[in-house]
Design a protein with these regions (language model features):
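Glycine-rich phosphate-binding loop at the start of an alpha helix
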Residues: 8, 15, 53, 57, ...
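Short, flexible loop/turn motifs enriched in small residues
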Residues: 24-28
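Short beta->alpha transition motifs characteristic of CBS
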Residues: 40-47
Length: 163
């Protein structure tokens, strides 16, 4: 089996984490790190408490703690919304091999707007950045949008992409 076999289950879990974040009064973002079909770590958004505590940041830190290394080569990061620039740089620093997100973020996405996840030039700064990860966007977008629509975060989703 490969990572693609687990994409739907892991993305569904991210959407559940996003809903849990909304239920506790925070922004609707959930993320997790997996490798070889095994859940390594999860993260719920906690930016209401600390502005840099995005779901991806927490999932990456938790994966680092669990695995005992900051080299997460071979891991996939799943997230309910496209990672922002800060999270995208962290994904590159942790050397994540694959990123799967549900909702595009046309105003602040680290992939669709700022191209950080695809930027091959960052590789020249080894050992700080890993190679560009494989990126799959729009996975279970409709389901993630249902959670997003419970909040004022209307600007996320493919319908808001600039033409």
């Amino acid at each position: 089996m490969n990572d693609y076999t687990f994409d739907e289950a892991f993305m569904q879990r991210c959407i559940e984490l996003a809903q849990a974040s909304v239920n506790r009064g925070d922004a609707p973002f959930g993320s997790l790190v997996a490798r070889d079909g095994e859940l390594i770590a999860e993260g719920l958004n906690d930016a209401q408490t600390k502005v840099s505590e995005h779901a991806e940041v927490i999932a990456l830190h938790n994966a680092h703690s669990h695995l005992g290394t900051s080299d997460l080569t071979g891991c996939t990061l799943y997230t309910s919304c496209e990672p922002c620039p800060m999270c995208s740089f962290m994904i590159r620093e942790y050397k994540i091999s694959r990123v799967v997100y549900a909702l595009p973020s046309p105003f602040m996405g680290g992939h669709s707007k700022w191209n950080i996840l695809d930027d091959a030039e960052l590789e020249q700064f080894k050992p700080f950045f890993g190679k560009p990860p494989e990126v799959i966007g729009g996975y279970l977008e409709k389901e993630s949008k249902e959670v997003m629509n419970q909040t004022p975060f209307w600007m996320f989703g493919s319908e808001h992409k600039k033409q």
